[in-house]
Swiss-Prot record:
Pfam families: GDPD_2. It is an enzyme of class 4 (lyase). It comes from the Eukaryota. Its EC number is 4.6.1.-. Expressed by the venom gland. This is Dermonecrotic toxin LhSicTox-alphaIA1ii. Keywords: Cytolysis, Dermonecrotic toxin, Disulfide bond, Hemolysis, Lipid degradation, Lipid metabolism, Lyase, Magnesium, Metal-binding, Secreted, Toxin.
Length: 273
């Protein structure tokens, strides 16, 4: 999965997919009542990027729905996975469940069109703080209460704070999650980070009894780092330059080992060599 980083304006969806992304990451900020408010990152952000592009959250969802609904004039067949980077740092811990409920209602209405031919992309809820695990239950309970448990098939999870793998496992246990787990590891492109924790996550994924299904590394803009991440066995690479990742995947060393995921590839299934 080539994951376009910080796609917060509707116009950027096309831009990143046209460069080769089959997945995008979108920032979601919350107001003081735990309502998802904007798709917005703000300053500081990655080097070389405009940090200030934004939409109202529900407007972005409608644009995203158009881009991921077959038959729509804006439809992009390649776009199959969306990671919502939930900026829950502005919330109190006791608001996490509420944030999940409100997020679910927004997605149900504006993205999934109340289950009536809505957007088809797989969705990952990416939460920075393991203490905010009640967000997951708030979200999943709401989908069930609203009569759409089938949409849980489209839903995956990520704790993005680079916490110890064991602590993340505990948070999932508390949240009642087993499966559909992406594990992120990374740092802003302005800084360097080694692959120690990525390798640990990959080992958990491949152990047969770990909690992780997929591993992605962020934010990768250089060919050398892309090669290192692929060599470590990641499933996804988040990038500001999808064309760089595409170029590396076309190199002889990687062409036979990797391909770009399509809608038919289940993002919740651990890949077996």
């Amino acid at each position: 999965w080539i994951m376009g980083h910080m796609v917060n304006a509707i116009g950027q969806i096309d831009e990143f997919v046209n460069l080769g992304a089959n997945s995008i990451e979108t920032d979601v900020s919350f107001d003081s009542s735990a309502n998802p408010e904007y798709t917005y990152h703000g300053i500081p952000c990655d080097c070389g990027r405009n940090c200030k592009k934004w939409e109202n959250f529900n407007d972005f969802l409608k644009g995203l729905r158009s881009a991921t609904t077959p038959g729509n004039s804006k439809y992009k067949e390649k776009l199959v996975l969306v990671v919502f980077d939930l900026k829950t740092g502005s919330l109190y811990d006791n608001q996490a469940n509420d944030a999940g409920k409100k997020l679910a209602k927004n997605l149900l209405q504006h993205y999934w069109n109340n289950g009536n031919n809505g957007g088809r992309a797989y969705i990952v809820l990416s939460i920075p703080d393991p203490n905010h695990y009640p967000l997951i239950k708030g979200f999943t309970d709401t989908l069930k209460q609203e009569g759409h448990p089938e949409l849980l098939d489209k839903l995956g999870y990520d704790f993005s704070g680079n916490d110890a793998i064991g602590d993340v496992a505990k948070a999932y246990k508390k949240a009642g999650v087993s499966g559909h787990v992406w594990q992120s590891d990374g740092i802003t492109n302005c800084l360097l980070r080694g692959l120690t924790r990525v390798k640990e996550a990959v080992a958990n994924r491949d152990s047969g009894n770990g909690y992780i299904n997929k591993v992605y590394y962020w934010t990768v803009d250089k060919r050398a780092t892309t090669r290192d991440a692929l060599d470590a066995g990641v499933d996804g690479i988040m990038t500001n330059y999808p064309d760089v990742i595409t170029d590396v995947l076309n190199e002889a060393a990687y062409k036979s080992k990797f391909r770009v995921a399509t809608y038919e590839d289940n993002p919740w299934e651990t890949f077996k060599k």
